[in-house]
A protein has these predicted regions:
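Active-site bordering "gate/hinge" segments
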Residues: 1-190
Length: 191
């Protein structure tokens, strides 16, 4: 597995995370502040908002033919609050201000009850769900489908050229692009 580590300055990575995880869904710093303030209505020691988008793509070639391809996008928001030794956590696959505030209220209620719990909130359709969600520097997007198939064919040709006894070649390529943004009361901590 090859990991691509971005060497871009943190500010640029933050801007990319905001462009992928906040802006398409109409979320702003004010939205994050409202959610954190909602959690803070109960006495808590710590709270954070965790946004994540993961894109996966895979291709496989067998006997000179592309046999399968896969593509998936998983995204959502999680809200966590810590009160004493208890942790409350709520999450949703929907990234929207309504889902964020629902999760914040749920976490506040759990924390106020003195329990440690995890709650998955229901999915709501999102206006941005049909939009293009990938940052221009997404490494998966650096090659189009034709180029990915050509890469697999090149691997097959190279393998067969090494030894005439090679009668079957199976090749695959898979990639995953993950973007995370964590917001805390004192400001964003990680991208």
């Amino acid at each position: 597995m090859v990991r691509m580590i971005s060497r871009e300055p943190t500010i640029e990575r933050l801007a990319q995370a905001e462009a992928l995880l906040l802006q398409p869904f109409g979320l702003t710093d004010a939205s994050l502040t409202r959610a954190l303030a909602t959690i803070g209505e109960h006495r808590i020691d710590d709270a954070d908002l965790y946004f994540q988008s993961t894109r996966h793509e895979g291709w496989s070639l067998e006997e000179g033919i592309v046999k399968s391809g896969s593509f998936s996008i998983d995204q959502g928001v999680g809200v966590r609050a810590v009160a004493g030794e208890k942790t409350a956590f709520a999450y949703s696959d929907d990234i929207s201000e309504a889902a964020l505030l629902d999760a914040a209220r749920t976490v506040r209620t759990i924390a106020a009850s003195g329990q440690s719990r995890r709650v998955k909130l229901g999915m709501r359709p999102s206006v941005a769900a049909s939009r293009v969600l990938y940052a221009p520097t997404d490494p998966i997007a650096t090659l189009d489908s034709t180029q990915k198939v050509a890469l697999l064919e090149k691997v097959e040709k190279l393998a067969r050229s090494r030894d005439p006894r090679i009668v079957q070649v199976m090749a695959g390529v898979a990639a995953e692009y993950d973007v995370v943004l964590v917001a805390r009361e004192i400001g964003r901590a990680h991208v």
